[in-house]
């Protein structure tokens, strides 16, 4: 049986904590999500590492200064697009 590499273990661990909604620190809401509570939980660190746009959004003073779970609305995205982006 082949053993997993450190990279595979790390990526698998990240996927697991996202799926289990553990230690999330931001919620994302699409522009077409007009219902309250329709948001996607995510991790700021992962979003920032994968996207320069998210990095810029998450480094604004408004987001950095808050101590609560932020919800960021991305009005130009549809919910299905946002789900695909986060996964």
Swiss-Prot record:
CDD domains named among the record's database cross-references: BTB_POZ_ZBTB_KLHL-like (cd18186)
Any idea where the BTB domain is? Answer: 24-87
Q: Identify the keywords attached in UniProt to this record, alphabetized.
A: Ubl conjugation pathway
Q: Which GO terms describe its biological process?
A: protein ubiquitination
Stored PROSITE patterns: BTB
Q: In which pathway does it act?
A: Protein modification; protein ubiquitination
S-S pairs = none
InterPro entries noted in UniProt = At1g01640-like, BTB/POZ_dom, SKP1/BTB/POZ_sf
Matching entries from Pfam families are given as: BTB (PF00651)
Q: Which PANTHER family match?
A: BTB DOMAIN-CONTAINING PROTEIN, BTB/POZ DOMAIN CONTAINING PROTEIN, EXPRESSED-RELATED
Q: What does this protein do?
A: May act as a substrate-specific adapter of an E3 ubiquitin-protein ligase complex (CUL3-RBX1-BTB) which mediates the ubiquitination and subsequent proteasomal degradation of target proteins.
Domains (record comment): The BTB/POZ domain mediates the interaction with some component of ubiquitin ligase complexes.
Report what the protein is called. Answer: Putative BTB/POZ domain-containing protein At3g29740
């Amino acid at each position: 049986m082949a053993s997993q590499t450190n990279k595979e273990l790390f990526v698998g661990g990240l996927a697991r904590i996202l799926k289990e909604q553990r230690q999330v620190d931001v919620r994302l809401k699409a522009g077409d999500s007009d219902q309250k509570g329709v948001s996607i939980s995510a991790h700021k660190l992962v979003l920032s590492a994968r996207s320069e746009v998210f990095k810029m959004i998450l480094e604004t003073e408004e987001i950095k200064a808050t101590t609560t779970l932020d919800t960021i609305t991305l009005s130009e995205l549809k919910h299905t697009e946002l789900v695909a982006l986060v996964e």
